[in-house]
C-alpha cells in the first residue's frame, strides 16, 4: 500500500503498523459481535498495536488484510470518530466487477457459480470460520497455496 499511496498522493504522510495477531484472533472467532470476553481480548490487542498510530494523529486507517474488517467496529471505537476506516476489499471487489462487466466477462446473474477457495492457512481452519467472511459458507473445494509463490 505504501508504495502505491506515495505514487498516487505525493507528499502523503504514512504511518504503517503490522498487526500479525489480528489474523489468528479473527480465525478463532474473536471478532466484532462475539462474546464480550472474546472482545475484551481483541480490544487489548488492538490497543497494543494501534495506540501509537492513534497518537500519531492519523485521519485515515486502511484495513490492509482481508481479516481486519471483521474487527472494524472495535478498531473504529478505539481509533475514534475522527478516523476514517477504509476496507480495500470492498473497493477491489467493486473494481473487479466493473472490469469484468466492461470486458463482457461478467457472468449472468441468473446462474449461481461454483466456488473454489484458495487459502494460505490450513484449509480446515477456513471451513470452520468461512461464515465470518462470507456470511454463509455454501461449501466448495478449499486448497492451501504458498502465497509467497504468487
Residue ranges and their predicted role:
Residues 1-150:
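Non-catalytic structural scaffold of enzyme domains
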Amino acid at each position: 500500500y505504501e508504495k502505491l499511496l506515495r505514487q498516487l498522493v505525493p507528499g502523503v504522510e504514512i504511518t504503517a503498523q503490522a498487526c500479525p495477531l489480528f489474523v489468528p484472533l479473527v480465525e478463532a472467532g474473536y471478532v466484532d459481535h462475539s462474546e464480550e470476553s472474546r472482545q475484551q481480548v481483541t480490544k487489548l490487542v488492538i490497543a497494543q498495536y494501534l495506540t501509537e498510530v492513534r497518537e500519531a494523529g492519523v485521519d485515515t486507517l486502511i484495513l490492509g488484510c482481508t481479516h481486519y474488517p471483521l474487527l472494524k467496529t472495535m478498531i473504529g471505537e478505539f481509533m475514534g470518530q475522527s478516523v476514517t476506516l477504509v476496507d480495500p476489499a470492498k473497493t477491489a471487489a467493486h473494481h473487479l466487477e466493473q472490469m469484468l462487466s466492461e470486458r463482457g466477462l461478467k457472468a449472468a446473474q441468473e446462474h449461481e457459480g461454483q466456488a473454489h477457495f484458495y487459502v494460505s492457512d490450513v484449509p480446515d481452519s477456513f471451513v470452520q470460520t468461512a461464515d465470518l467472511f462470507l456470511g454463509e459458507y455454501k461449501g466448495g473445494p478449499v486448497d492451501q497455496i504458498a502465497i509467497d509463490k504468487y
